[in-house]
Amino acid sequence: MKAPVRVAVTGAAGQIGYALLFRIASGEMLGKDQPVILQLLELSNEKAQAALKGVMMELEDCAFPLLAGMVGTDDAEVAFKDIDVALLVGARPRGPGMERKDLLLENAKIFTAQGAALNKVAKRDVKVLVVGNPANTNAYIAMKSAPDLNPKNFTAMLRLDHNRALSQLSLKLGKPVGGIEKLVVWGNHSPTMYPDYRFATSDGASIGDAINDQEWNAGTFIPTVGKRGAAIIEARGLSSAASAANAAIDHVRDWVLGSNGKWVTMGVPSDGSYGIPEGVIFGFPVTTENGQYTLVKDLPIDDFSQKYIDKTLAELEEERSGVSHLLG
């Protein structure tokens, strides 16, 4: 049996956490031969800690052979001790009448503290995925608060946007989603992100040629993917939790186990490619192997695409400037 991998999950008793933990414990994220120890962080209030205890009881009751141990805590340094993987799911949701800038600042406090805790106690090669919104900027804050860790260890989740876009293309083409490759989602995990199928193929054939409808692209496809989260809240009365958890599993599984040459979208610190300033955490096409990701470089960016990329970058830079005074 392999040595257990330590996985931290924050916001562990929340909706996404509840949809995520059982799948991690069953081996869906790191492999069916990889034992895991779950290190679970929740808020210190009584209600959150009681809910966490209940979730841990349920995890025990599943008798997962791969679940080698659990820790439940309200202390980030306990949750992050010696971890290999961190899923930062917990974030302050936007309350009624709350301005976006207030939300940014509230979350900046959380992710500054969590970045510092990771810096202090996590393994030096820890893989960090930020799910809690605003995910790109929260990941940037955590990265900047962990100066002793490699910035490449910090990523933001754009896989939900990527999967949503795959599904919309599959519906449009009437073709199975599994045959679609080389889709890209550029930018921020927000309604400004840009799903781009110019390079995508379905069973090897160009999707751009098959659809060949710029009106559908600009008027239906891009806004449908961008507003999908809001549409789910409207329909369900709650935000998308199971699909977000599924995307987190996909993101980490591909990062750790490899994407087998397939392009996937990850929010990663820019190296200056595609005119994105260095260090900005931005959705890019990547391939992954041996626990490392590599940017897909030198894709041509046409005027239509540049407009969308500029817009999502402007939003990210605005978010970054809103929290820069907290980062020294």
From Swiss-Prot:
Reactions accelerated catalytically: (S)-malate + NAD(+) = oxaloacetate + NADH + H(+)
Binding site for NAD(+): 11-17, 107, 114, 131-133
A single GO molecular function term of this UniProt record: L-malate dehydrogenase (NAD+) activity
Keywords tagged on the record: NAD, Oxidoreductase, Tricarboxylic acid cycle
Residues that, per the record, bind substrate: 94, 100, 133, 164
Signal peptide: none
GO biological process terms held by the UniProt record: malate metabolic process; NADH metabolic process; oxaloacetate metabolic process; tricarboxylic acid cycle
EC number: 1.1.1.37
Function: Catalyzes the reversible oxidation of malate to oxaloacetate.
Family designation: Belongs to the LDH/MDH superfamily. MDH type 2 family.
Protein name, entry field: Malate dehydrogenase
Protein's organism: Xanthomonas campestris pv. campestris (strain ATCC 33913 / DSM 3586 / NCPPB 528 / LMG 568 / P 25)
